[in-house]
Design a protein with these regions (language model features):
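Charged catalytic cores and adjacent phosphate/nucleic-acid-binding surfaces used
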Residues: 1-143
Length: 143
């Protein structure tokens, strides 16, 4: 695999951060700006991960509504097994679990009737408990 600037990794390190640059040119400043804004998915054992909530990226603000749409696309790295579960949380409670056995996912979820106050978030879990992708939460707009 390669890093942000196209350099081949010297060692096999399964840890990665997927950072949303929002169309900015990859640079130290744009990466720091995105990380500070929380536009990140921390992952271990994944080749790809992308999660949105009502079209917003992780770390962003979303309008809390009666029905919210989450989209996830993810792929495990070679030799790291399959995606086994997707969990959706409202604040600190699991509100949906999707059990799977797939190397790649491209799925939509509609979440309704939740009573969360602060945020909604998702976790993508693999066979090995240490293989996980965790996006920054989607925070509810105030007011």
């Amino acid at each position: 695999s390669v890093d942000l600037f196209g350099f081949r990794r010297i060692i096999d390190n399964p840890a990665a951060n997927f950072i949303y640059l929002n169309g900015e040119t990859p640079s130290r400043d744009s990466v720091v700006k995105a990380v500070r804004a929380g536009h990140v998915i921390a992952a271990c054992g994944f080749d790809a991960a992308d999660v949105t909530c009502d079209g917003q990226i992780p770390g962003g603000e979303v309008r809390k509504s009666a029905s919210m749409k989450l989209h996830v696309t993810a792929a495990m790295a070679e030799n790291y097994g399959n995606i086994k579960e997707i969990r959706i949380y409202a604040d600190d409670r699991i509100i949906h679990r999707e059990l799977l056995d797939l190397n790649k996912v491209d799925m939509d979820f509609t979440v309704s009737g939740m009573d969360a106050r602060y945020f909604i978030r998702m976790e993508i879990a693999a066979e090995n408990e240490h293989r996980l992708a965790v996006p920054t939460p989607f925070y509810f707009q105030r007011g």
